[in-house]
Amino acid sequence: MGLSLMLQGTASDVGKSVLVAGLCRIFVQDGYRCAPFKSQNMALNSGITINGEEMGRAQIFQAEAAGIEPDVRMNPVLLKPTSERKAQVVLMGKVACSMNAVEYHQYKPSLQQQICEVFHSLASEYDVIVLEGAGSPAEINLRDRDIVNMGMAEMVDAPVLLVADIDRGGVFAAIYGTLALLRPAEKARVKGVIINKFRGDISLLQPGIEQIEALTGVPVLGVMPWLDIDLEDEDGVALQTGKYDGATEKALDITVIRLPHIANFTDFNALAVQPDVRLRYVTQPSALQPSDLIILPGSKNTLGDLQWLRQNGLADALLTAHQAGVPVIGICGGYQMLGKRIIDGVESGIEQMDGLGLLDMETRFAHEKVTTRVNGNCLLALPGLLSECVEQPIRGYEIHMGSSLLGADATPFIDITERNGQSGGWCDGAVNREGSVMGSYIHGLFDSANFTRALLNALRQRKGLAAYQGEILDYTHYKQTQFDLLAKAMREHLDIERIYQCMKTHRQGSVP
């Protein structure tokens, strides 16, 4: 058995996912074969493995940090909320069922053996596994059936580091309270604390660190500053906290409508890092102005979010903006909303609903989920805005339930040449006759650097601006540089040698 280490948090969004990615990068740099693991992830941001299996985006970007191919064993249970009370349960990359919170809480014990087996299968292929918890281990109302925090650490006998976020205030109370609520054996498993997101003079923090170490008996292994490093977010917290407000004006203004059940908003990270793009997430009709491009993102509740668009006034505002010449792109659920009609029987109690009518297309939902990685190219002779994108290569993945049938006034967008490694010929998406409205089922569309730059230059041309002359930003390469910056910062601010000692000493102490 190799080494293992688990990061748990005093709360959600304390930075566990990013720190796990950083540790994976460090261990790989130090010559270890390393993989991430999170037994249960609740998120609407997901991706597809090379085998067509669905898993959380957080474990995908952690695998990227480790320089390895994402493997569904890294995230055996994925919960995707479909409403305020219900979630779709994805087991080992495939949809199993939908449950409410009470049903799932009763169901969890039956998953323990499978999760344990999956972990050991993964661990047998690597030198180090870095586990991530969820929320806080001090959720005492959920402890008896826990499979993701201390319950998981006990299953595989992993030492734990506790991550606390100082930016939100009350960091010492959060550390002390969390440790106080743990059982004695659980507290003994916590080998150190990481204080995250610090701003200011660390000397002012030192007296508090000394006191919390004395009070708890647990050492603080470092204080991570607030970093200007751009990495993917696990869930919608970043949207709620205004990370993507787009305060700085740029040559192009792109707005994404922040649907209540927005899914895979990481689709647009590649746009956010472009030097000439201001990306904004909006929830009010007035915020659509000024826009050079409006994007309708994916949704886990397409009909519910379409109703919300109409009730909120955003549907009318979008149609008005389009009539004034603003192009519109829809991705997955957003693509479906742009059509004439959606026929359901799967997602909600609504049998059918009229779409926004911007594309001559009808969508019919199905029970079977499509989960594929795809490669392809923009089709020849695309009209309007997309004329600059002809034959540009496209890579991405599909996650959807249903299919769309195009009418005479719509043309396909993308020629898919490969699905899950199998060659063939398929068409994806739709474009209207004028080339001002387009949609696709492909997530990660804007990660295709040449396509994205061609599209952005077409938008620049519409505004009378010259084409961007700088280097084309490759988002995949960009992420790799961010992982290296993260690892460098963690080496500077954390006691990495002591973290190694925690893992090795714990393993030695566990050997009979």
Swiss-Prot record:
GO terms for molecular function: ABC-type vitamin B12 transporter activity; catalytic activity. Gene3D superfamilies: 3.40.50.880, P-loop containing nucleotide triphosphate hydrolases. Keywords: Cobalamin biosynthesis, Glutamine amidotransferase. It comes from the Bacteria. Pathway: Cofactor biosynthesis; adenosylcobalamin biosynthesis. InterPro entries: Class_I_gatase-like, CobQ/CobB/MinD/ParA_Nub-bd_dom, CobQ_GATase1, CobQ_N, CobQ_synth, GATase_3, P-loop_NTPase. Residues 251-451 form the GATase cobBQ-type domain. The keyword Metal-binding does not apply. The active site is at 332 (nucleophile), 443. One of its GO terms (biological process) is cobalamin biosynthetic process. The keyword Transmembrane does not apply. Pfam families: CbiA, GATase_3. Catalyzes amidations at positions B, D, E, and G on adenosylcobyrinic A,C-diamide. NH(2) groups are provided by glutamine, and one molecule of ATP is hydrogenolyzed for each amidation. Belongs to the CobB/CobQ family. CobQ subfamily. This is Cobyric acid synthase. It comes from Photorhabdus laumondii subsp. laumondii (strain DSM 15139 / CIP 105565 / TT01) (Photorhabdus luminescens subsp. laumondii).
